[in-house]
Amino acid sequence: MNFAETLERDAQPIIDEIYQDHFIQELLKGDIKKEALRQYLRADASYLREFANIYALLIPIMPDLESVRFLVDQIQFIVNGEVEAHEYMADYIGENYNEIVQKKVWPPSGDHYIKHMYYNVYAHENAAYAIAAMAPCPYVYAMIAKRAMKDPNLNKSSILAKWFEFYNTEMDPLIEVLDDLMNQLTANMSETEKNEVRENYLQSTVHELNFFNMAYTSEKWQFGGERV
């Protein structure tokens, strides 16, 4: 078992919790509050913009040209490709996706997640720390979708089933490259450094759990500080 595989194994209990939580279970059944999906789409639009920016920041510290090309491709995918999955949710809501995300939200859970990733870009010269903070995002979505496609409770007649179909396959190439990078960049690390990278990965998996819950509860700042 390589290093990336151990991270994915260690994250599994958190992913199980994400799958069993309200947001994914109601999405699975094709019966979820429309306001929860609006909150998710608005927060995710903000999140993905920053995700693309972080990819751009990593370009100068990539180990080879192939990795740079990969990051450029991922920026393009975030800008153009992943909108398809969002459109399915917008169709369920019955509103235009671009109109939904015109209202900007910056909820606490999204804020903490994004800052966790930025911190690891700037705090460490080795890109493994930042990649460990970013890699759980596609992995969590892929694992949830693959599990959902085998779940008898999946409402295949709902437009929301297409959301699971999208993530069932679209994340696989990205996960493979991130895993390869993770293994390459941690190969000469000490056990202490590897444990720090592992902690980053697990923290981001918890951030994924909190992000879905943020959408379901329409999480807002309680004492000011909401970003416009």
Curated annotation (Swiss-Prot):
Keywords: Hydrolase, Thiamine biosynthesis. Its EC number is 3.5.99.2. It catalyses: 4-amino-5-aminomethyl-2-methylpyrimidine + H2O = 4-amino-5-hydroxymethyl-2-methylpyrimidine + NH4(+); thiamine + H2O = 5-(2-hydroxyethyl)-4-methylthiazole + 4-amino-5-hydroxymethyl-2-methylpyrimidine + H(+). GO terms for biological process: thiamine biosynthetic process; thiamine diphosphate biosynthetic process. InterPro entries: Haem_Oase-like_multi-hlx (IPR016084), Thiaminase-2/PQQC (IPR004305), Thiaminase_II (IPR027574), Thiamine_Salvage_TenA (IPR050967). GO terms for molecular function: thiaminase activity. Pfam families: TENA_THI-4 (PF03070). The record marks 47 as: Increases nucleophilicity of active site Cys. Pathway: Cofactor biosynthesis; thiamine diphosphate biosynthesis. Substrate binds at residues 44, 141, 167. One of its GO terms (cellular component) is cytosol. The active site is at 137 (nucleophile), 208 (proton donor). The keyword Transcription regulation does not apply. Homotetramer. Belongs to the TenA family. Catalyzes an amino-pyrimidine hydrolysis reaction at the C5' of the pyrimidine moiety of thiamine compounds, a reaction that is part of a thiamine salvage pathway. Thus, catalyzes the conversion of 4-amino-5-aminomethyl-2-methylpyrimidine to 4-amino-5-hydroxymethyl-2-methylpyrimidine (HMP). Is also able to catalyze the hydrolytic cleavage of thiamine; however, this thiaminase activity may not be physiologically relevant. Therefore, is probably involved in the regeneration of the thiamine pyrimidine from thiamine degraded products present in the environment, rather than in thiamine degradation. This is Aminopyrimidine aminohydrolase. It comes from Staphylococcus carnosus (strain TM300).
